[in-house]
Amino acid sequence: MSGRRILLGVASGGSPTAPFLDALGKLALPAGVAALERSVAVGNFIPAQRELIMDDALAQGFDYLFFVDDDIVLPPNALELLLQTAEADPATAVVGGLYYSRDSVRPIAVADWCSTDTSSAHVPAFTATSATFVDGVGFGCALLRVSSARTLSPPYFPAHIYIERSAHRVRQCDEDYLYCERVRDRGYFVRLDARVRCAHYDRTSDSSAPARWEDDAQTGTSRMIVAESGTTRLVPLDTSVPRVAETHARADVVYISVD
């Protein structure tokens, strides 16, 4: 690991949380790794912000890009463990830490994920000590091998706009899973390092998810999300259950760049 250069990348809305900053100040650097340089991109469109940060990582010749969202609370050894997993396998392009959705319902990682039908995805099985092969991890805490990005054509981070018509609700999502799919298509691997347990801070409730960490008996089997009476929960994977029907329509987004 000696001589590895790592860029810390933060895509922020402009108001980083206090728990994020406190944890960042306690982050341990792996042996032989120079002090972290930082690239912070402020805005309200995460894919473009990640694009700016990746441009910095490529232009400045970093070995790894360490994405951390400004509402994620890292354990002190997060970077040490993620780098250990990445260095053990040069074919691993992305290693993600474990964190949950703010409602504590699900870990942010997917198996059997496909960009043309996201309803095929489920939550992969993992244990507290595993570095499991998965299809995608959240980039709230993720270490990316920069050399694998060089095999892709920019822009590096496409995105989905998820439209819930009955609820009249729209959200941007999946730039992390789509990047993972792109590098997997190039023959690389994506791993979830469940040793890295990150809290996901909610500004509104001033609390962190998960409310309670699941044990191996719960996480050691593949699971799927079901919606019942307005709430969601995880249940063991059952491929016979009908999936939500999706329709996909492409809409152009043009990046206009100025100096």
Locations of regions flagged by a protein language model:
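Conserved catalytic core of nucleotide-sugar-dependent glycosyltransferases
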Residues: 75-163
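A short, glycine-/small-residue-rich helix N-cap motif at loop->alpha-helix starts
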Residues: 44-49
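Short beta-strand-to-loop acidic/aromatic patch adjacent to the donor-nucleotide binding site
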Residues: 62-73
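N-proximal low-complexity "stem/linker" segments adjacent to membrane-targeting elements
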Residues: 1-40
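Hydrophobic pocket-lining residues that define ligand/cofactor binding sites across diverse proteins
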Residues: 57, 86, 183
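Short, high-confidence coil segments that cap the C-terminus of an alpha-helix
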Residues: 62, 90-92, 188
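Active-site nucleotide-sugar/metal-binding loop of Leloir-type enzymes
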Residues: 52-64
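C-terminal catalytic/acceptor-binding lobe
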Residues: 155-247, 251-258
